[in-house]
Amino acid sequence: MLKRTMGRLLLTSLVITGLAGTIDDNSISKKERKYAIGLMKETRDEAINSTKNLSEAQLNYKAAPEKWSVKECMYHIAGAEKLLWGMFESNMKGAANPEKRSEIKVTDEQFVKMVQDRSNKLQAPEPIQPKNTGFTSITEAIEDFKKNRGEHIKYLKSSTEDMRNHVVQMPFGWIDCYQLCLMIAAHSNRHTQQLNEVKADAGFPKQ
C-alpha cells in the first residue's frame, strides 16, 4: 500500500514539474514537423549541390555588374540562415501572442510559394548583402550554412515549443514562428534558383 502511494506521489510530482512530458508540450503536429524538416533538408541539398564542381571563374561570373555571382548567392544564403534564425529565437523567447493569429492571412504552402517566387523581386537587407556577410570563400560559406542548417533541423526534430502561438510581424504581413522556419528553408531555395539563373546565362564560363 505504501509503495503504491509513493508511486502515485512520484508520478504526480513528475507531471507537476513537467518531467513526465505532459506539461508545456505545445508541439507542432507530426505532419507539420515532417513538412518543415523535409523542406529544410531538400533546400539544403539543392543549395549545396548547385555549387559543386565549379571553377573560380564560374563562381565569380556575373551576368551584369549589378547582378550577383554564384559565390555571392551562396554568401547571402548562408548569411540569411543565421539572421533569420536569430529572429526566430528572439521571437520564441518573447511572450506568446495567440491573439495575433487572426492577422495571419496565408497558409503554410501559400507562404512557401510566395517566398520562393522569383518574379517578386526584393532588395536584400544590408547585413546580408554578400559583401557584408563576412565570408571570404565559398567553402567557408557552405560549411557555415551546413552547420547552421543541421542545428535547425535538429531543433525541429525534437522541439516541443509553441511555435504557432508566437506570431511575428514582418514587412509583408504576419506569420507565426513555425512559418518563420519554413521561410528559412524557402529563402535558400529562392536564392538557389537565382544561383542557377547565373549558371544558365549565355555568358557563363564553360569551365
Model-predicted segments: where are they?
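Stable alpha-helical elements in mature extracytoplasmic
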Residues: 36, 43, 47, 69-70, ...
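Short, helix-capping/interhelical loops that line the mouth of catalytic, cofactor-
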Residues: 12-35, 86-143, 202-207
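Residues that form generic nucleotide/phosphate-binding pockets
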Residues: 39, 50, 87, 91, ...
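Start-of-domain marker
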Residues: 26-67
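Bacterial N-terminal signal peptides that target proteins for export
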Residues: 1-10
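A charged, solvent-exposed segment within the mature domains of Sec-exported extracytoplasmic proteins
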Residues: 118-184
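Short, contiguous alpha-helical
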Residues: 61-110, 154-207
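Generic structural signal for well-ordered, non-membrane alpha-helices
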Residues: 42-52, 82, 86, 119-123, ...
